[in-house]
Amino acid sequence: MQNLNDPKIIVALDFPSQNPALALADQLDPAKCRLKVGKELFTRSGPDLVKALQSRGFDIFLDLKFHDIPNTTSAAVAAAAELGVWMVNVHASGGEKMMVACRERLESFGNDRPLLIAVTVLTSMSDEDLAGIGIASSAEAHVSRLATLTKNSGLDGVVCSAQEAPRLKAEQGSDFQLITPGIRPLTADKGDQQRIMTPTDALKAGSDYLVIGRPITQAPDPLAALESIHAEVVAV
């Protein structure tokens, strides 16, 4: 059974602006999910949206995938920490110096620091896509390489597909957090995610948190959809 005080579902607020995002949030239960704010929504609506969601009781995963020189990226994750988000991410391909700088910058926040997660291989990318940018290894092998770099840099975990989860748990240890997008109940459309898995299967594979978007946000009754998936998740 899952810890009910640590919701495993992260609902992706993939909306173009604040009003529909808040309207959806008002239909959800912060005891059963956290919320992910990504690039489009944050660029348009900014920190005020994050604060509005936090005022409704939600923990926020700020999904901006920072990737820049160490000083710039570490300043960005510090700004996220000042905003009080629960989780923030960077691109592992930014390298060890960048990731270490981010981790060190967050140490001053103590127990209030957000989880610092790295992005490995985007779930929309196939082996052919990786080959197109000069990476000859498979997506799975490249994820493992970047996950090892992430752990060696002292970060909390990685974003990865559920298919890589068993291997990453074996390689990196049970405390290394795995955040998995591409989660779809069997009845949902595959969308643009190439590597997908059901919530139950993902948790059993080793995923710690599940990012779920359209199956909840575009459901006729988002709360009912959330509660259905939540019931499935807590039973694992």
Swiss-Prot record:
Active site: K65
Molecular function via GO: orotidine-5'-phosphate decarboxylase activity
UniProt-annotated binding residues for substrate: 14, 36, 63-72, 123, 184, 193, 213-214
Family according to the record: Belongs to the OMP decarboxylase family. Type 1 subfamily.
Pathway it works in: Pyrimidine metabolism; UMP biosynthesis via de novo pathway; UMP from orotate: step 2/2
Subunit annotation: Homodimer.
Gene Ontology CC terms, in alphabetical order: cytosol
Protein name, UniProt field: Orotidine 5'-phosphate decarboxylase
Keyword Lyase: yes
SMART domains found in the cross-reference section: OMPdecase (SM00934)
Catalytic activities: orotidine 5'-phosphate + H(+) = UMP + CO2
Physiological role: Catalyzes the decarboxylation of orotidine 5'-monophosphate (OMP) to uridine 5'-monophosphate (UMP).
GO biological process: 'de novo' pyrimidine nucleobase biosynthetic process; 'de novo' UMP biosynthetic process
InterPro entries linked: Aldolase_TIM, OMPdecase, OMPdecase_AS, OMPdecase_bac, OMPdeCOase_dom, RibuloseP-bd_barrel
EC number, UniProt record: 4.1.1.23
Keyword annotations: Decarboxylase, Lyase, Pyrimidine biosynthesis
